[in-house]
Amino acid sequence: MSKLGVLLTICLLLFPLTAVPLDGDQPADRPAERMQDDISSERHPFFDRSKQCCHLPACRFGCTPCCW
């Protein structure tokens, strides 16, 4: 078991986790841009243009406003 600990310590010293480059283009890192890129409700495939709202099943997938 101590050999495994030594190996793990050596690996962490040679390649620390902070050296891993983070991908700054991921949407989770930029919530404001993610909201701008989000599909608008009027263009949502389940948006009912005649009622100007989304049916209940579509509301579960982020389409708003909902037809109640």
Swiss-Prot record:
Tissue specificity as recorded in UniProt: Expressed by the venom duct.
Residue positions, PTM 4-hydroxyproline: P65
Propiece residue ranges: 20-49
One GO cellular component, as annotated: extracellular region
Cysteines paired by S-S bonds: C53-C67, C54-C63, C59-C66
One of the record's GO molecular function terms: toxin activity
UniProt free text on domains: The cysteine framework is III (CC-C-C-CC).
Protein name: Conotoxin Mr3.4
Organism: Conus marmoreus
